[in-house]
């Protein structure tokens, strides 16, 4: 029984990382749009979420429609364009890759 529970735990932890990856400011450089590093994940059917700073945020409209809060609290302002945010396109592209089987 103990081995069976260990097996189930291993499967569950593996499944959690199948559709996600850790992203960082170091990886993206100045183009990194968030104030914290964290996990970018895809939840079927195409909801891209970001887990960072102890919370889960919607990165796209599909995730917002599933009830996740907007990413705005951790989305950096663009220092070269006052009133705008840093482009989130590269993160969306990476998220879409995670959504493909």
Regions found by a protein language model. Give the residues of each.
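Sec-dependent N-terminal signal peptides
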Residues: 3-13
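Cys/His-rich metal-chelating microdomains
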Residues: 19
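Short N-proximal segments of mature Sec-exported proteins
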Residues: 22-65
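Short, intrinsically disordered, charge-biased short linear motifs at domain edges
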Residues: 2-3, 28-31, 84-86
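C-terminal partner/receptor-binding element of secreted or periplasmic proteins
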Residues: 68-101
